[in-house]
């Protein structure tokens, strides 16, 4: 998802008066603007995906706290917010696809350690997989 795509969605959310989408997009656009200032230039698409993932993680944590505090109003609000944020992310790889990708990387690079496999996986499929699952699968394949 590019910055211009996000801004177009933001404009559409303003026009349709969709408060949750607007709130989520404003948070992401603000994070992108801060990163742009930090980088002193445009933010690459890979970094935008990472920023959206951070927002998703933050929203999940807030949702967990709301559930622990039994705050029904906040739970509903953050579930909607989380759904909007997750819709901005690229499609996640299934466990089978991830397994195939790791096998291909091991075959191509001949890697025997976890580090090189995870590095190659990150370069090729950044933001499209769960790191814990990938790490567990890679360990399993390398020790087998």
Where are these regions (language model features)?
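Charged, compositionally biased, marginally structured helical/coil segments
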Residues: 1-144
């Amino acid at each position: 998802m590019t910055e211009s795509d996000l801004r177009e969605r933001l404009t559409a959310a303003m026009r349709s008066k969709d408060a949750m989408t607007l709130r989520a997009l404003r948070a992401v656009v603000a994070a992108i603007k801060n990163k742009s200032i930090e980088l002193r230039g445009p933010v690459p698409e890979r970094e935008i995906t990472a920023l959206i993932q951070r927002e998703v993680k933050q929203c999940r944590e807030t949702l967990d706290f709301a559930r622990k505090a039994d705050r029904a109003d906040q739970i509903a609000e953050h579930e909607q917010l989380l759904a909007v944020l997750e819709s901005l992310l690229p499609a996640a790889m299934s466990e089978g696809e991830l397994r195939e990708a790791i096998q291909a990387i091991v075959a191509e690079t001949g890697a025997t350690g976890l580090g090189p496999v995870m590095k190659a996986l990150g370069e090729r499929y950044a933001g499209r997989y769960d790191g814990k699952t990938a790490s567990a699968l890679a360990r399993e394949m390398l020790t087998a």
